Amino acid sequence: VPHFSVPTLDGTFYFQQEWTGHDIYYFLFKYTDSNGNSNSATWGQNPGTFIRGLPENVHLFFGSFDSTYHTDVVNRKAAVENSLNPNEETAWEGRIHYIDQRANSITGGLGQMISNFNSPMYMGIDRFQMARETGSLYAWTSSNNDPKHLIHEPHQWNAEFPVEIRRHDSGVQEITALD
């Protein structure tokens, strides 16, 4: 993912300055289509429960495609602050960002991700600096979408990292079983 910068409620976030190779960058966007259909059930989930389930190396971004983007992220910030206790707020300080720009006008690497993904409401950047789409939110057991499925994506990206690093170790011989 190439460099990008976005205005946030706390100042401009510069990806190139923040990139360490140890963190995951996770983006959740609110979206309402022309018929009024939206992902408000997912967007409106309890952010405290969601955040508590994420790995500690996540930078979490909230943004919106809607014309009400500023109000959307201000309200999301209030919901986050109301759902975390003081210790959790301290632990996540500087790691939760509220994008103060309409998502469809974002440029740079993040803008490219938004333009190229089929459903850019939930996506991330892994530790290899690769753009990642999220999987399905559908829960077969309840026959509904379950926003908590989003918690698993960054855990999986973290789990893939040491495996991929190990594949490049000169002491490892990779053998293709099926081609």
Which residues make up each language-model segment?
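Non-globular targeting/processing and membrane-anchoring segments
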Residues: 1-32, 38-65, 69-119, 124-179
